[in-house]
Amino acid sequence: MYREWVVVNVFMMLYVQLVQGSSNEHGPVKRSSQSTLERSEQQIRAASSLEELLRITHSEDWKLWRCRLRLKSFTSMDSRSASHRSTRFAATFYDIETLKVIDEEWQRTQCSPRETCVEVASELGKSTNTFFKPPCVNVFRCGGCCNEESLICMNTSTSYISKQLFEISVPLTSVPELVPVKVANHTGCKCLPTAPRHPYSIIRRSIQIPEEDRCSHSKKLCPIDMLWDSNKCKCVLQEENPLAGTEDHSHLQEPALCGPHMMFDEDRCECVCKTPCPKDLIQHPKNCSCFECKESLETCCQKHKLFHPDTCSCEDRCPFHTRPCASGKTACAKHCRFPKEKRAAQGPHSRKNP
């Protein structure tokens, strides 16, 4: 009996040591993961604009979101449905109009000088037997929200503006006197801490992270023939992903927004040809092919059409403002001339019949 009790105690001690060793082994990993989450939270809390927030949460493709905000017609470049809009993001989709509203609201609520009215008597600290008419004046004072809980909107520069008011004293012994009053006007504002603090002193709120969403980052863009695996937190081949074929992941791949011969220029917010043409050749605007321009002002004029130098084509509509030429015909303002041989043929005839 005593021997069995000793064996049980030994196994219990070994089990306790094993559990402690396992917790010590994973402790640094958990602390490191928690530290990463805290840093990410700090960055998100300190974001001062929608663009900065998207830059943090979607660091690889924030420029495209900026383009979508700037260009309202960007979403119409793709013929797919709204749920599969042209985007290189593999994260959550946002409606572009909603983002515009959020961005405008964010800008309006930033810490900045705002027009407000202040009571003159309280502002100047006058006695109760003196009052002003009008009693209040319009000035600019700092107001708005800061992006961190520990900061407040404070003025960094002040000017004094003069207001002409009636000063009245009681009991009334004379008529109201017109006096100049100087009132503080805030010209600069900034979010400043109220007191020195620890950089990580923000109150933490309890957030439960679902087991299936514990990747250190959100879904990422995967190469063609690969899909994002939320369990492995990485891109895997389609045959390795158990959900392959059961869910439409076409929106996670590089979209065919600009076609096979073009690419999206994030700085210019437009589709451009991947390979430019030599200077002596014209580039087709749709398929980016290079060709020699065979049309000219003269050839188009013979067809009774107008020459478009950018597309090297003869079209009915003028790309510039039209004006009447000396011949009485209407032509482009920059192309008000006709073929030389035609003018030569018209010359003698015009001299005979002025």
Curated annotation (Swiss-Prot):
Sugar-bearing residue positions: 155, 185, 287
Tissue: Highly expressed in lung, heart, small intestine and fetal lung, and at lower levels in skeletal muscle, colon, and pancreas.
Keywords: Angiogenesis, Cleavage on pair of basic residues, Developmental protein, Differentiation, Disulfide bond, Glycoprotein, Growth factor, Mitogen, Repeat, Secreted, Signal
Main location: secreted
Propeptide feature ranges: 22-88, 206-354
PROSITE patterns in UniProt: PDGF_1, PDGF_2
Cellular component GO terms, alphabetical: extracellular region; extracellular space; membrane; platelet alpha granule lumen
Record keyword Cytoplasm present: no
One GO-annotated biological process of the protein: sprouting angiogenesis
Region spans: 4 X 16 AA repeats of C-X(10)-C-X-C-X(1,3)-C: 222-318
InterPro entries: CXCXC_repeat, Cystine-knot_cytokine, PD_growth_factor_CS, PDGF/VEGF_dom, PDGF/VEGF_growth_factor
GO molecular function, one term: vascular endothelial growth factor receptor binding
Job description of the protein: Growth factor active in angiogenesis, lymphangiogenesis and endothelial cell growth, stimulating their proliferation and migration and also has effects on the permeability of blood vessels. May function in the formation of the venous and lymphatic vascular systems during embryogenesis, and also in the maintenance of differentiated lymphatic endothelium in adults. Binds and activates VEGFR-2 (KDR/FLK1) and VEGFR-3 (FLT4) receptors.
Family recorded in the similarity comment: Belongs to the PDGF/VEGF growth factor family.
Quaternary structure, from the entry: Homodimer; non-covalent and antiparallel.
Name this protein carries in UniProt: Vascular endothelial growth factor D
Organism: Homo sapiens
Gene: VEGFD
